[in-house]
């Protein structure tokens, strides 16, 4: 850490973070198991191309996005710029993987002659992806691009935090809609007969909800927020003084 002694990590935080990672990794593994055991696996140049869509979305917009949000809780005492870069990189990886998932489903529909963007899941999915891209672009402009002033960053930060959590929540909800849509399409009336695929997918849905809940709980614990470093506190005091009409060095 730069500029002072490291702040103590809250006792329970590492356990909640570890639990969230266990849920997330199990979620990704179970998604792969569902697609491998019941949907034939994944291949780009065949009827299995569609299966790349759910796997990419779970990895990108759920697991990686959730972990990007947790960066400031996990790396509490590292240099702020290092943490920012990691936060931004995880979001880039999530965006790229999600884009692959979008290309997969649109390309599959084109080859099969299926209609696009008619379901609630598809509408929500496009909304989430666009919001996520805009959130990343604006966040990069404000927090990583050197031209943004400290005062501008301070004003935008609450909106960035709110929309980050909201987009993640929308991503989880959209994934649940897509899972239900896939089950109804593939199983039809057999879904109500407790088919093994349906049971596995229901457990997958519960894991989605639990991972989302675990991430949001960690994010909303005020006492688990990253402590301000010395240089951040100095900048904050300077900004406060400037907004009150005095110069930082007037006293």
From Swiss-Prot:
Q: Which reaction does it catalyse?
A: monodehydro-L-ascorbate radical(out) + L-ascorbate(in) = monodehydro-L-ascorbate radical(in) + L-ascorbate(out)
- Which lineage is the organism of this entry classified under, starting from the top rank? Eukaryota, Metazoa, Chordata, Craniata, Vertebrata
Name the residues that bind heme b 1: 53, 116-119, 121, 181
Which residues are modified to Phosphoserine? 247
Annotated residues for binding of heme b 2:
73, 80, 87, 160, 225
- Is the keyword GTP-binding in the record? no
The alphabetical list of record keywords is: Acetylation, Cytoplasmic vesicle, Disease variant, Electron transport, Heme, Iron, Membrane, Metal-binding, Phosphoprotein, Translocase, Transmembrane, Transmembrane helix, Transport
Q: Known EC number(s)?
A: 7.2.1.-
Transmembrane ranges, per UniProt, are 17-37, 52-72, 86-106, 125-145, 159-179, 199-219
Report the domain of life of the source organism: Eukaryota
Compartmental location? Cytoplasmic vesicle, Secretory vesicle, Chromaffin granule membrane
Q: Which Gene3D superfamilies match?
A: 1.20.120.1770
Stretches assigned to the Vesicular side: 38-51, 107-124, 180-198
Query: What does the entry give for GO biological process?
Result: ascorbate homeostasis; electron transport chain; intracellular iron ion homeostasis
What would be one Pfam family of this protein?
Answer: Cytochrom_B561
Q: Which disease is it linked to?
A: Orthostatic hypotension 2: An autosomal recessive disorder characterized by severe orthostatic hypotension apparent from infancy or early childhood, low plasma and urinary levels of norepinephrine and epinephrine, and episodic hypoglycemia. Some patients may also have renal dysfunction and reduced life expectancy. Orthostatic hypotension, also known as postural hypotension, is a finding defined as a 20-mm Hg decrease in systolic pressure or a 10-mm Hg decrease in diastolic pressure occurring 3 minutes after a person has risen from supine to standing.
Relay the cofactor remark from the entry: Binds 2 heme b groups non-covalently.
Biological function: Transmembrane reductase that uses ascorbate as an electron donor in the cytoplasm and transfers electrons across membranes to reduce monodehydro-L-ascorbate radical in the lumen of secretory vesicles. It is therefore involved the regeneration and homeostasis within secretory vesicles of ascorbate which in turn provides reducing equivalents needed to support the activity of intravesicular enzymes.
What protein name does the entry list? Transmembrane ascorbate-dependent reductase CYB561
Task: Spell out the molecular function terms from Gene Ontology.
Answer: metal ion binding; oxidoreductase activity; transmembrane monodehydroascorbate reductase activity
**Principal cellular location given in the protein's record:** membrane
**Tissue-by-tissue expression:** Expressed in many tissues, in particular the brain especially in the cortex and hippocampus.
- Where in the sequence is N-acetylmethionine found? 1
């Amino acid at each position: 850490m730069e500029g002072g002694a490291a702040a103590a990590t809250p006792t329970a935080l590492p356990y909640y973070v570890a639990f969230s990672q266990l849920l997330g990794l199990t979620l990704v593994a179970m998604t792969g198991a569902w697609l491998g055991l019941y949907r034939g696996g994944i291949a780009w140049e065949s009827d299995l191309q569609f299966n790349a869509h759910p796997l990419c979305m779970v990895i990108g917009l759920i697991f990686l996005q959730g972990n990007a949000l947790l960066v400031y809780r996990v790396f509490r005492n590292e240099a702020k710029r290092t943490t920012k870069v990691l936060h931004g990189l995880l979001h880039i990886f999530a965006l790229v993987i999600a884009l692959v998932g979008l290309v997969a489903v649109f390309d599959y529909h084109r080859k099969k002659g299926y209609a696009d963007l008619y379901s609630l899941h598809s509408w929500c999915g496009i909304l989430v992806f666009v919001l996520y891209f805009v959130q990343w672009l604006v966040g990069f402009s404000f927090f990583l691009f050197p031209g943004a002033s400290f005062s501008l960053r301070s004003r935008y930060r609450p909106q960035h935090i709110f929309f980050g959590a909201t987009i993640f929540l929308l991503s989880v909800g959209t994934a649940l809609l897509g899972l239900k849509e896939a089950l109804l399409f593939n199983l039809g009336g057999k879904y109500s007969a407790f088919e093994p695929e349906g049971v596995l997918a229901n457990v997958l849905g519960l894991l989605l909800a639990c991972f989302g809940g675990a991430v949001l709980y960690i994010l909303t614990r005020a006492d688990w927020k990253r402590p301000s470093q010395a240089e951040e506190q100095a900048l904050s005091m300077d900004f406060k003084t400037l907004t009150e009409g005095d110069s930082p060095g007037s006293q």
